[in-house]
């Protein structure tokens, strides 16, 4: 009887360990694609901003988004690999856009969902090409925003 009880306990431990191994394997296979780079041969965010300049689009100062005053307090998800803030002086002080470069679709979707979830009155233009997200101030006209989108499409 005692031997039978030990045998059942051992079997329960073995089943528990097997369940744990299967669970860990499932978690690994589910998260692995999110960790692998989705895109290759992406331009840097500064390359995209320079392409705007080269094509004659209005671009004032540009700098890494981390140098933007108050960036750390902004609720924009920080899932990007690198990003550049650029100003468009005709839109007013501190108005312009940002170019974000992402490693995975999941990280890109997090930022795109944030911007697209903003109230319509302040929702910026958001364009995506090859893992690069362009966010433009909503004060700009649709036709002007389209010019930046076209350069992004040609560059990324």
Predicted regions and their residues:
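Soluble, non-membrane globular domain cores that form compact, hydrophobic packing
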Residues: 1-96, 102-156
């Amino acid at each position: 009887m005692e031997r039978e009880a030990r045998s059942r306990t051992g079997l329960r431990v073995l089943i528990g360990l097997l369940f744990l191994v299967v669970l860990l394997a499932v978690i690994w296979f589910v998260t692995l694609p999110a960790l692998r780079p989705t895109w290759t041969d992406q331009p840097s965010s500064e390359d995209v901003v320079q392409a705007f300049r080269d094509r004659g689009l209005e671009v004032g100062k540009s700098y890494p988004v981390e140098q933007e005053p108050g960036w750390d307090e902004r609720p924009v998800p920080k899932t990007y690999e690198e990003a550049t803030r650029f100003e468009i002086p005709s839109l007013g002080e501190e108005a312009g856009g940002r170019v974000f470069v992402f490693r995975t679709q999941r990280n890109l979707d997090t930022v795109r969902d944030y911007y697209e979830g903003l109230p319509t009155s302040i929702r910026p233009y958001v364009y995506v090409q090859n893992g690069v997200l362009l966010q433009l101030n909503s004060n700009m006209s649709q036709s002007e925003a389209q010019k930046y989108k076209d350069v992004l499409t040609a560059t990324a």
